Amino acid sequence: MAPLGFDTTLTSAGDALIALSGELDLSGAGPLDEEIDRLASEDGVRRVVLDLRELEFMDSSGLRLVALAERRLGAAGRELVLVRGPEAVQRVFEITRMEDHLTFVDEPDGDGAAA
């Protein structure tokens, strides 16, 4: 399995698209959390879109990061949107019932924003 990698793209619509790859676990959660924290206070960002399509694995550290990111972004007047990941990743959200409380889309739109 691969360590967490991520690439952030800012769109003209005010979305920050973070494309994730590899494993979202304790070792990779810190740098991603710092990036989300930075985006929560950046002017012009209205939504943070986490693209989970290339994520291979996610543990409870990843779930915690997503839950805290949603809270932090909401407090800053921003929205968190998740692009659905592979079945194994989505299953973690289903089992914990977090899927009922988060915004998921199937893919980002053409500008990189959430559809």
Say what each PLM segment does.
Residues 59:
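Conserved G/P- and acidic residue-centered "switch" motifs that form tight phosphate/ATP-binding loops
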